[in-house]
Every structure is written in C-alpha cells, then in structure tokens.
Amino acid sequence: MANTTSAKKATRKIARRTAINRSRRTLMRGTVRIVEEAIAKGDRDAAIQAMKRAEPELMRAGQQNIIHKNNASRKVSRLTHRIAKLAQ
C-alpha cells in the first residue's frame, strides 16, 4: 500500500493509464482478428477493408508504446503480405 501522497497519486495515475491502454490494446487486437478471419475465409475484399481499419490502430498502438513500434510494423507487413497472397 502506498504511504506518501505522491505514491498514492502515482497509483491512481497507473490505474487510469492501465485502463486506457487495456482498451486500446483490446481494440487493436479486435481489428487484427477481423483481418485474420477474412484471410482465413479467403475473402480478399473483406480483408482489404478490415486492413484499412487495422493498420492505423496498429501504428497508433506502436506510437503510444502499447506495443513496440517495430512489432506494429511487423504485424502490418505480415498481414499485408498474407492479403497479397490471396490475390494469387
């Protein structure tokens, strides 16, 4: 348990930030899941539309240190590559 007032404030701040980050991470994972489901079905058009929503979420998560920025770029790259393979 925090004893000093600054430690108590830090605890409140961490709780707020954790809640925000959790919701952003959930949103990001949900958009990626929609893309992966469209790829699994082989629906290229749906995958492209879902990717248009997922890419900004991934990059935003990378900028806000919810995930590492290289991790965000890697996910975007791999999903884009998988969508491109659907066209073949």
Swiss-Prot record:
<comment type="similarity">
    <text>Belongs to the bacterial ribosomal protein bS20 family.</text>
</comment>
<protein>
    <recommendedName>
        <fullName>Small ribosomal subunit protein bS20</fullName>
    </recommendedName>
</protein>
<dbReference type="Pfam" id="PF01649">
    <property type="entry name" value="Ribosomal_S20p"/>
</dbReference>
<comment type="function">
    <text>Binds directly to 16S ribosomal RNA.</text>
</comment>
<dbReference type="GO" id="GO:0015935">
    <property type="term" value="C:small ribosomal subunit"/>
</dbReference>
<keyword id="KW-0687">Ribonucleoprotein</keyword>
<dbReference type="InterPro" id="IPR002583">
    <property type="entry name" value="Ribosomal_bS20"/>
</dbReference>
<keyword id="KW-0699">rRNA-binding</keyword>
<dbReference type="GO" id="GO:0006412">
    <property type="term" value="P:translation"/>
</dbReference>
<dbReference type="GO" id="GO:0005829">
    <property type="term" value="C:cytosol"/>
</dbReference>
<keyword id="KW-0694">RNA-binding</keyword>
<keyword id="KW-0689">Ribosomal protein</keyword>
<dbReference type="GO" id="GO:0070181">
    <property type="term" value="F:small ribosomal subunit rRNA binding"/>
</dbReference>
<dbReference type="GO" id="GO:0003735">
    <property type="term" value="F:structural constituent of ribosome"/>
</dbReference>
<dbReference type="InterPro" id="IPR036510">
    <property type="entry name" value="Ribosomal_bS20_sf"/>
</dbReference>
